[in-house]
Amino acid sequence: MGSYKQLAVDGRQVKMLFSPRQAQLLLLGIMLLIAVGMLLGIKVYLMLAAALLLTAICTRWRGKSWQKIGVAVGKGLYRSRHVVLILALISILIGLWKQNGTLATLIYYGFAFIRPEVFLVMVFVLSSLVSMLLGTAVGTASTIGIVLMGLAQSMGMPGGVVAGAIVAGAFVGDRSAPTSGPLHLIATTTGVRSEELLRYVFSTLIPTYLLSLGFFYLLGLLYRPEAVDPGTIRGFQELLAGHYPVALYLLLPTLLLLALAVCRLEIIPNLLFTLTATFICSLYGGFSPAAIFQSALWGYSPAADLPFAAVLSGGGLLSFRAILLVVMAAMSLTSLLEDTGVIHQAMASVLDHIHTVPQLILATSLFSILGVAVAFTQTVAIVVPGTVLQSTYQRLEVDRLVLGRTIADTGVAASGIVPWSSAAMSPALVLGVPVLEFVPYAAYCWLSPLVTNIFGLLGWVKRNRLPLDKGREGEAAR
């Protein structure tokens, strides 16, 4: 098909099979394919697989052998193994926490902190605490979120305001928790250690969280329930304690998870220790090994007529299979696009105009949010900028931890307020509130991009320590 120029990309020579125009058209076609599929209700992983097939056919047409295409796809699958294992362990952990009463206990004692004068603040705090344990915004909205919405409705609080506080808190953990799938995908994509990224994202989390607390305190002055009926809260607690295990010892695995994270233990050993502690708690609580295994694999399913059945069901390895397939398909697609130079060719004209740190942070933010807006999913918003911008961060001598943090602050945190994204629509469906009604009140979601760009303007970024090629050598293995 002709001769192609070789360019150094991320410390290696890559043959550019496509012209910049062809590369842009291919990426546009991939985005449109995914967008149309989402609108038609087709599963994301199927559309990513179709995009992978389209890219493979175009690559073969440009002269690359099927064997080399397979090698490139295999590299992507290999790179995804770390985050896939983490997500698998998290899915098992959530299933067991729902079965043995850990989540019910957390909700039970969480109600003790409800105060009418700071109701919205407490909704945000409780939601964020649960999300820091579950690591998923949808899971948080589906558990504590439903309960808090029911309590708020009994007090006549506006649904959009309360849903905004719930969603804001839910995305704290979706972005920052040790059990967060998106966070580990960011680490894998950018080639940094999950433990280092977990610590580094707190540099913007803390000011954003404090600003969000201030926002909900002020908002609570406008939307304040006259009183919280103690009987209503006691009723919720009695329903929980009457039908599910509630005991303080069940919180020990959650404390262990957080303590090991603070002690800088790597996430996989951390999850394995936490799973072991959870297994022991389940046995102590009277669950048989067979029942524990069933919840670990298929998730927990209480009887449909029990109160909170919809709240405390789910989890399990098989419930995460679609997410695992999305990650593997996205990493394989990105690997093939990298190997053919498509991403570099398509974005080179933009990347060449980035000369300062503020421009770099802004470009990362826009690329990441655009990924959510076009592909409706966090995965594309993480993988594409996490791959495309690494060489630009290297050129400006900015550490890849900053790249990971910026993606977390934008493609993950802000995805909750992109009205047509799955990250926003799922909590909306669970809570029964339209996305546009809670967007103005989901303060954390729209403050995160602002804070991370302010950090960029002020030059508060970590400078590069390692050459890019050396840093990537063991990215997934670590």
Where are these regions (language model features)?
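Central hydrophobic cores of alpha-helical transmembrane segments
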Residues: 141-147, 166, 270-280, 407
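Juxtamembrane membrane-interface segments at transmembrane alpha-helix termini
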Residues: 58-68, 152-159, 176-180, 281-292, ...
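Extracellular/periplasmic helix-exit of transmembrane alpha-helices
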Residues: 91-100, 219-233, 280-305, 334-339, ...
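Hydrophobic transmembrane alpha-helices of multi-pass solute/ion transporters
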Residues: 10-89, 99-118, 241, 255-329, ...
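Hydrophobic core segments of alpha-helical transmembrane domains in multi-pass membrane transport
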Residues: 26-38, 50-60, 87-95, 126-131, ...
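Transmembrane helix-loop junctions in multipass membrane proteins, especially transporters and channels
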Residues: 39-42, 59-64, 103, 136, ...
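Membrane-core helix-loop-helix motifs of multi-pass transport proteins
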Residues: 14-18, 34, 151-244, 399-476
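Membrane-embedded alpha-helical segments and adjacent helix-loop junctions characteristic
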Residues: 66-153, 305-391
